[in-house]
Amino acid sequence: MFNDDGKRLISKLTDNMVPYILDTLTTIDGHEVYYDDIKNLAGHITDKILQVGVIDPEELNVLNHSDCWLSNIMFRYDRESGKLLDSYLVDYQICKYGSVAIDLISFLLSSTKLEIKVNKFNYFVKQYYDQLIKHLKLLSYNKKFPSLIDIHKSLFKNGIWGYMAVCDVMAASLLEETESASFDNLFSDSPEADAFRTLLYNGKTYKEHLKIVLPWLHNRGALQKETI
């Protein structure tokens, strides 16, 4: 994803989708708070997202799935009780060594229910952190362990990845059933493609999540054009 082909894909998914996002925002109460931030980001989002892929040797770096959302997880349930027994990640096509923010932000913004997406974000980060430390010890990791604050610093630093998730996996996961859903319609210039993109970013459920997520990203500084 962080090569030339990936750059073109990211641009299509983010910078090119700004007009659709802005049109949708005008229908959401309170959008004035963050509307200009997103408008000013247009043309700069791709480069900011690519910066997330730059490895910082001073931070903890992990092997990310890089497309971590519910559609790429298989679940195994007990046939009688329905109890969840196990889960497996699938589709390892774009794995990336780098910041923990890549998978954490993508998964937590795309695959959680509306009522816990923001309200329980820090809770889930703590659960991740506890499991991380447990397994670093299990694997006899011999470098300095990250603190929970270190993980949060990485999430704040790479907050623009949250906007990537909003345009990409969150939109896909909340898309209402339609026969027009296809990669061609996501990226081509036809009237049918334009209609699909309008549907993708203007769905009722998607807008309910936008109304919660975008102010949250705004308040975290994730939508700032310039880093102070």
Regions found by a protein language model. Give the residues of each.
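Helical subdomain adjoining the active site within ATP-dependent kinase catalytic cores
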Residues: K144-K153, N158-I228
